[in-house]
A protein has these predicted regions:
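Positively charged n-region of N-terminal signal peptides that target proteins for export
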Residues: 1-9
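Residue-level detector of conserved, function-critical positions
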Residues: 21-434
Length: 434
């Protein structure tokens, strides 16, 4: 029998899930070494590494002795890093730049003062091209974008752009940022220049050739590292009022709000100058206004407002009241997932448990579950099943389906979400081992 990661690899074939051809999963062989299997459990890369992770794009993290590196789908080691270089795939379940489209962030702790004036040297390994940039930057923007350019900071702290296909700088580092630089979205990045007091004094739209487009006089990005969403980004005028520009550099929603958030699915949350909060459409029309002090989260055309003690109401962005959920100790109701299910949270003392309600307001699963903390937060039912822990009862884990039923019974000591057709799970054996 194959000895797989954490004891067992669940081989459920998920009906109706998206095609997962090409997924390869890390597994531990009888020889104590690691390789990769396909969805049928067949060895594709025989166990020969001291350590291995799942494939991201065309490459997988591997370890040989004290050195980390990467292997391709033929099992060939394409890069072995120096012993003190660390490859970081992400944190708290997030994959840097996306599982299939992103990077591994690489860094090396420097000994003593180095040319960057920082304790870390950073670089990246691209999951699609297999390009290793080398460790030569003060920072790398690992956030997701749909561009083959990535923002990096040089030794002065200025930001520019490197090709993920060559590892070479293509737009010189000269822009200011208080965080990670602005990545490209739909062909454009929002870049800024500061004064000596770190105030934004000029904002430009930048295309992928390096051409700069100024914004109208008196208009600047509302924040460093602005994200272009739905073709718009937040700006602020000389009076401190917020509005929106498009990727042509035109102000399409005049500055008029006390605060503004990015657009999603055609709508954005704003704070108005009278202290109320609301939702606007892409013309700037206020489609909802509330005196509630909480900023509204808009997702999949819906938002939630508290409507009493332990009571929450789901609305459409058109203002239609969809349903109200009320119950003892309910403290949160989330906007719907793509499958139309909404998570709600019950809090008793310091304990929080989650359940699910459909868009008719019917509870399909009582709030008694917690989720794997190492899976990507905010992503639920990724392949039609949701990994759950029964902390207060059996203290075991299983999988809910979209009807709220346990499709895979509570039997595991730990679980992960399904990726493709397989998920890693663990079971406690009779001798107490996992």
């Amino acid at each position: 029998m194959k000895k797989l990661l954490c004891g067992l690899l669940c081989l459920l074939m998920l009906l109706g899930c998206a095609s997962a051809e090409g997924y390869l999963y890390s597994a531990k062989g009888d020889n104590g070494l690691w390789g990769h299997i396909d969805e049928a459990g067949n060895w594709v890369i025989p166990p020969k590494f001291d350590g291995a992770g799942d494939f991201r794009g065309n490459y997988a993290w591997i370890q040989q002795g004290d050195r980390e590196g990467f292997a391709n789908r033929d099992g060939e080691i394409v890069l072995l890093l120096d012993e003190n270089v660390v490859a970081d795939s992400g944190y708290d379940g997030f994959y840097y730049g996306g599982r299939e489209t992103g990077i591994w962030l690489l860094y090396k702790e420097a000994t003593g003062k180095n040319s960057l004036g920082t304790e870390w040297l950073e670089g990246f390994f691209d999951v699609q091209s297999g390009v290793y940039s080398g460790l030569k930057w003060r920072g790398v923007n690992h956030r997701e974008s749909n561009s083959r350019l990535i923002a990096v900071a040089d030794e002065t702290g200025k930001w520019g752009y490197v090709s993920r296909d060559t590892g070479e700088m293509v737009i010189p580092a000269k822009y200011d940022s208080d965080n990670m630089g602005s990545n490209f979205y739909d062909g454009y990045a929002v870049v800024t220049f500061w004064d000596d007091d770190y105030n934004i004094v000029q904002t430009l739209l930048l295309d992928e050739t390096g051409k700069e487009y100024p914004l109208p006089e008196g208009i600047n990005a509302a924040y460093c590292d602005s994200v272009i969403s739905d073709g718009l980004f937040e700006v602020v005028d000389e009076n401190g009022l917020y509005g929106y520009c498009n990727t042509s550099g035109e102000v399409v929603i005049e500055p008029q709000f006390a605060y503004a958030f990015e657009f999603e699915d055609g709508y954005a949350a704003v704070e108005l100058t009278d202290g109320t909060c609301g939702v606007i459409d892409q013309t700037g029309n206020v489609v909802m206004r509330t005196t509630d002090s909480l900023h509204v989260q808009i997702r999949h055309g819906c938002y939630v407002l508290p409507t009493g003690e332990h009571s929450f109401t789901m609305y459409s962005v058109a203002g239609e009241e969809l349903f109200t959920l009320q119950g003892e100790n309910i403290v949160e109701l989330w906007t719907p997932e793509e499958n139309g299910l909404c998570m709600y949270v019950v809090e008793k003392g310091r304990q929080r448990r989650c359940g699910w309600v459909n868009m008719q307001g019917k509870i399909i699963s009582e709030a008694k579950w917690t989720f794997p903390e190492y899976d990507q937060p905010g992503v639920y039912f990724p392949s039609g099943l949701q990994a759950v822990y029964d902390i207060d009862g059996t203290r075991l884990a299983g999988y809910l389906d979209e009807s709220g039923e346990l499709a895979i019974p509570l039997q595991f000591s730990f679980v992960t979400q399904f990726y493709g057709k397989l998920a890693y799970v663990g079971m406690v054996q009779d001798d107490g081992t996992t």
